[in-house]
């Protein structure tokens, strides 16, 4: 049976990267919340 996690740098950046987050209102909310919480890393 194939594993569900098949790592790919490009896919990871495109779906969870900073620019991807900036692009949508929901993503911007994620960034805002992570900034407020004081996360070291905002995105992947």
Curated annotation (Swiss-Prot):
Xref: HAMAP family: Ribosomal_bL34 (MF_00391)
Please provide the Gene Ontology terms (biological process) for this protein: translation
One GO CC term, this protein: ribonucleoprotein complex
| Name of the protein described by the UniProt record | Large ribosomal subunit protein bL34
Please give the residue ranges the record annotates as the region Disordered: 1-44
| Source organism (scientific name) | Thermotoga maritima (strain ATCC 43589 / DSM 3109 / JCM 10099 / NBRC 100826 / MSB8)
Q: Which family does it belong to?
A: Belongs to the bacterial ribosomal protein bL34 family.
Pfam families reported in the protein's UniProt record: Ribosomal_L34
Keywords from UniProt, A to Z, are: Ribonucleoprotein, Ribosomal protein
Q: Which domain of life is it from?
A: Bacteria
Q: GO molecular function: any one?
A: structural constituent of ribosome
Query: What Gene3D superfamilies would the database entry show?
Result: 1.10.287.3980
